[in-house]
Amino acid sequence: MCEEVLLNDIWSFYFHDPYDSKWTYESYNKICDLSSAQEFWGLTDLIKEKIQFGMFFLMREHVFPCWDDENNKVGGCVSIKVLKNDVVQFWEELCIRVLGETLLTEKYKQLWNFVNGISTSPKKHFCIIKLWIKTQDLSLKDCFNLPKYYHGEVVYRSNQESIDTDHLKNN
């Protein structure tokens, strides 16, 4: 039996139905908490083929996957477009870099605690993978060691901008 490899933080894994238009706490399903590499690989085996069809969130335990969470409000999301054929591998490699704390480049690694999580959002022929960031200090593509197979530009959007846009749309 292998020795358990503990993560430096506990990470929570959520699912949100892509067809559910409600974005309330109740509309998210918390699947589990992960505290070891072995737990991550067990979960990965279960969801691997589903990752391109659902909205999944891997977040630090104390961070809820919504823009207006106290840990997300002043930060934003870095969005990466990944073609459907590459989503499973990209998601897996990105998760490994997040959980292993190797996502940030050398210049920015001291800001590691500002990485709140990652998520996936399915579209027709691709998925949008988002990095959830606590601060706008990590808004540049150069901050991250990203897997190479993504499509198009890496785009940052502040969560406050998303909150404001959503508020205008609903009023």
Give the predicted meaning of each segment.
Residues 1-4, 35, 42:
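RNA-binding basic/glycine-rich loop and surface signature characteristic of RAMP-family CRISPR effectors
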Residues 1-10, 26, 47-49, 53-171:
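Conserved NAD+-utilizing ADP-ribose enzyme module
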Residues 10-23:
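N-terminal, Lys/Arg- and Ser/Thr-rich interaction peptides
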Residues 28-33:
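A short, exposed loop/beta-hairpin motif centered on an aromatic-Gly-Thr core
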Residues 38-49:
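Short active-site loop/helix that positions an aromatic residue
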